[in-house]
Amino acid sequence: MSEALVKIENITIEYNSYGKAIKAVDDVSMDIYENEKIALVGESGSGKTTLAMAILRMLKPPGKITAGQILHKNFNLNDLDEEELRTRRLSEFSLITQASMNSLNPVLRIKDQLVDGLLDHGKFNKEENNSKIQSVLDQVQLSHSVLNMYPHELSGGMKQRVSIACAILLNPDFIVADEPSSALDVIIQRQVISTLFSIQKKYRTSILLIGHDLGLVIQFADRIAVMHNGKIVELKKTEDLLDSATHWYTKALLKSVPSFEEEQKASNRFDKLKKTREFSQDKK
């Protein structure tokens, strides 16, 4: 295993509700390695998104880190001021949200939004910027005609691909994808995940995929962390999780994954998931 790019060390996050502290994330530790695809799965309210926002220093009040630290390239993110954070976002780490419409400015054309991201990080060469923008659109398989369109003119899948293009614009080494396909239909979901896979392979970017669809993340992730009630209850390589899950919640998640071939139901669903993952990885 390569060197840890992101280190999450004993993080506890609390929300204050009517004077009472409620733990959303409870003493969580996890390493994310260079060139790794790792998934964090669990039901709604398990603490996944709260942890993801904390990793990127985007946690909003009343959420507060009350213990632990998060390191990126061995540098404590809590030590960064707002200007340093602004500089590092997009260029070193970035976010793909589950609601792409919320991350895109509705009154700006797509090209203007991409250009703004480059200008905000000191990229002023117009020719180079145009070339870079066209390149990232090619990477997410979008026509260059999208550049002259507004977000409301795009389908859900196209908007999500634009969000991915924004996230990779400055070649960050770490991306958090927070349920990037949750609002899309099944076919588009798999296209989005396939796009993430291609991006990761080309740029060797570390990606943390947040999700609740275990069947989907199995086809993407090298390792899977299972979160329940604010704790990571299991963290294993994907194949090992399928073969030897130990926590009752992980086992329940695995049993809830629907068969991919309903007309030919197998007696061992875990074997089917493994075969599906192997086929998906071979296709890529």
Model-derived regions: residue spans:
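A short, surface-exposed alpha-helical micro-motif characterized by mixed small hydrophobic
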Residues: 217-219
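Conserved ABC ATPase "signature" region
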Residues: 76, 127-145, 254
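Conserved ABC ATPase signature
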Residues: 150-154, 158
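Conserved ABC transporter NBD signature motif
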Residues: 64-76
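A short, proline-enriched helix->beta-strand linker immediately N-terminal to the Walker B motif
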Residues: 169-173
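Short catalytic/signature loops enriched in Gly
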Residues: 4, 237-284
